Amino acid sequence: FTEHIFARTDLSTREVLMRTALLPWMTGAIAEEVSGHPSAAQIVRDLYRRGLFVDRRADAQVRYQYHDLFREFLLDRCHVHYEREELSSLKRTAAKVAEKYRQVDTAVDLYAETQAWDELSRLICELGETMLVQGRFQTLQRYISLLPSAEQQQRPWLLYWSGMSRLVFDPVAARADLEAAYQQFERTGDNIEG
């Protein structure tokens, strides 16, 4: 049934559906931004009105979310429809949109999937202090662990945030991370206070 509905839509609509499926939820503005299509919001609203695979939530804003199986189908179609490089580019765009609209877990996962280490590292460093204050030590550690070890080792701020996030649970590893961060800061002349 899903395949039948999908096949009967025009190419532009199929692309909107596949691109918006890269995010777990969207507003009309997010749909348009992530798909690059000015009618994306209308397409998603129409699917909802027709009762086709879309849920709607209204809190501070109206958000749409594809049914899980439909989203999974669309994500599978992305891998068939797009070449690897184009799909990677679309995922990076989706990561930037997710970050902009505070879908942090999604942004982190998409940056990691596309091996956008600079963007992922920047985002982690921007979030590090806030996450520690919120007590989200393990989530911060999960984010950092998505980067390959070699990437972590050459980024003193990642080592610093890794050490800080481990202090409570693994003080020995925390000390190793913090010492490595200190050595990196010394070597690069970077200022830990800045």
Residue ranges of predicted features:
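Extended alpha-helical scaffolding segments used for macromolecular assembly and cargo binding
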Residues: 12, 80-173, 177-180
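General secondary-structure propensity
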Residues: 2-6, 91-98, 186-187
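Transmembrane alpha-helical segments of multipass membrane enzymes and assembly factors
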Residues: 8, 36, 59, 97, ...
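Short, intrinsically disordered, charge-balanced linker/junction segments flanking boundaries
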Residues: 98, 178-179, 185-194
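Alpha-helical scaffolds flanking conserved acidic
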Residues: 16, 156-157, 193-194
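C-terminal boundary/linker of central alpha/beta nucleotide-binding cores
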Residues: 2-79, 179
